[in-house]
């Protein structure tokens, strides 16, 4: 007896094409290229979830460094003095303060310098 799987095949292909909706060119129309594009996009998404963490850390360090240099101290010296003075604050919060709450950031820098000296 011949097995006809037309409806199942259509469902499977429709599912892949739905995932590829919005892709450019044949990647959103053709089943094979759409499937390849979706799998590739998952690969990029997995890789870039890791990369995002590194990118944000770089951004925070750049912002802290710029604000610290306005206070006359380098990033590495500031972080060393913060660790020495047992100030429990992470880079994300320091960067946020450096951008949006400059006076509080200045107070932390002064406190770190005073405690470590």
Swiss-Prot record:
A Pfam family: Ribosomal_L20
InterPro entries for the chain: Ribosomal_bL20, RIBOSOMAL_L20_CS, Ribosomal_protein_bL20_C
Domain of life, per lineage: Bacteria
Annotated GO CC locations: ribonucleoprotein complex; ribosome
GO biological process: one example: ribosomal large subunit assembly
GO terms, molecular function: rRNA binding; structural constituent of ribosome
Coiled-coil segments: none
SUPFAM superfamilies reported in the protein's UniProt record: Ribosomal protein L20
Keyword rRNA-binding annotated: yes
Keywords: Ribonucleoprotein, Ribosomal protein, RNA-binding, rRNA-binding
Keyword flag rRNA-binding: yes
Family: Belongs to the bacterial ribosomal protein bL20 family.
Functional description taken from the UniProt entry: Binds directly to 23S ribosomal RNA and is necessary for the in vitro assembly process of the 50S ribosomal subunit. It is not involved in the protein synthesizing functions of that subunit.
Protein name: Large ribosomal subunit protein bL20
Organism: Mesomycoplasma hyopneumoniae (strain 7448)
